[in-house]
Amino acid sequence: VSTSKGIMTDNDARVKNVGGEIICRVFWFIMSKLGKKPIQIPKDTKVKVEGGKLILTGPKGSKELSINDKIFTASISDDNSLILKLIKKNETSKVMWGTTRSVINNAVIGVTVGFEKILEINGVGYRASLKGNVLSLQLGFSHNTLYEIPQEIKLTVEKSTIIKINGIDKTLVGKVATEIKMLKPVEPYKGKGIKERGQYVLRKEGKKK
């Protein structure tokens, strides 16, 4: 094991409660490097900085983010980039720097072009339809399975077997896609169920009689 005290056996490192410092330092370096990287704001999108608050407005909608103004400062540069700077530098704030920068960047992408997940339904008689803000699914059960669509999500159904999930919040789009997939996960033998487009499904051969 590589440690700040040299190379040790795994057992010695456990006894002396050391190890992993090199990996941690590399991680802090990567997150710091990410945090320093400016976020380019597209011409159709506006970002307003108000203390510890960021207000983002773009073609797809608006979003408000809060940042810890005791740790970070945010500003807009002359070339229309958002710069996130650290006030206090320590191991924890360096990790938060990269994470916060990623959250802001995703918000910029979200209000500018949005995020999308596409689900595919496979199975004889399996289909989907929309009834207001409710997704109705026929998935081989004796009753329809209903899923209430969050207000922030735009959901469309194409050809009864394609579900498109759109929104400005990357996390919420992913959450909705996962919840719908879990209503009928793809089984490995015939591939029946709901899967994300491009998702690899490990197929199994059925038992031979």
Give short role names for the model-derived ranges.
Residues 1-209:
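Ribosome-associated RNA-binding proteins
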